[in-house]
Amino acid sequence: MIKNLFALGVFAPILAYSNSYIVKLKGEISTAEFSKFGEITEIKTKTLNFLKIKTSTSLSNIQLEQIRQNKNVAYVENNQIYKTQNQIDDPDFSKQWSLKNTGRNSGGFFSWGKIGEDVDAIDAWKLELGNRNIKIAVIDTGVDYSHPDLIENMWKNQAELNGQEGVDDDGNGYIDDINGWDFVSNDNDPMDGNGHGTHCAGVIAASHNNIGIRGLMREAQMIPLKFLADNGSGTLEGAIKAISYATNIGVQIMSNSWGGGGFSQALYDVIEEAQNEGILFVAAAGNSRNDNDKWASYPATYDLDNIISVGASDGKGNKARFSNYGKTTVDLFAPGVDIYSTFKNKSYKKLSGTSMATPIVSGILGLMMSQSQSLNFLELKEKIMDSTDQSRSLGSFSVAGRANAEKALQ
């Protein structure tokens, strides 16, 4: 069962399951007292304890108040639904205007784009190409980890790869999670049946291997964490688990091209937990032409220092017509229109959205970390924002301008 929830200050309707709830606990306690409300699932992160309560029908206000009044309960909220935010020698590099904009490769049928309105990737690669020590979680619809342009830069869980089949060799609660995890089906195969996550992964770190395209990073380790189903939607429960998994394996960057829910204290808490570990959370600003200063778009507009909110620009250097914006809540822009990248089933495709702009920023941050691994997340955030290209067309829409990889590495 799904219902629409409208929250004051949120532009779009909030989707949530009417028979599924997330309960934050104040400590480790017996779950038996909650079983009268429905089926109980425990969700534990590094420092947080949650329960999911699945009921046959919606809980009444009286029942919800009974849960809230429990001395061991911090809060209870609906299990919300999130969705994707999309609308060189490598033979298809010429199609990647976001990396090198010639004008001809970035415009529409009747008009060209503008030369140079890109992230200066070619000049950036003269300074840094990436590093296998940088781990980036792609929290999305999964990734086609067998794609020939991605396979070299996919993370492998060495403990499980070299361990015993059917055994949780690394003791993290997930059996045989060699390639990451599918939190939709709760299994060890995060293969992408949608294509969105694979597209994002290619933007970050498609190999520079004379096949297809190039990602921002020549070398990296990308971890596919699938919490969005093949139809592009996922739950608060899945988001919590995916973010917690990424935190526990020690990623440096989480790339998040999704959103659409209202404020969730549980989601805030688990992102804050990642912040406490020094992890950057790059988030799509949204695609509803929305002023995020007035109408929040989560998770991008949570007031947390590790979040970098990304809007989308077009081939002429303007704000993409669909992109959300916000002078105080959108940190910077990156190309997000007709972005050519890897896709499911070992293919390639153009997609548009703040979903596409987000992994560009994740990839630039990965290059910056490769160059200066001593910088903390606050220093990296400040540096990427201070090094943006300024323009009148974007100046009123974000804190900074458009991301520039070369300047960020200088």
List where the protein language model places each region.
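Loop/turn elements at helix/coil->beta-strand transitions in domains of secreted/extracellular proteins
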Residues: 72, 132-135, 218-223, 248-254, ...
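C-terminal subdomain of the subtilisin-like protease fold in secreted/lumenal serine endopeptidases
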Residues: 214, 238, 247-258, 264-270, ...
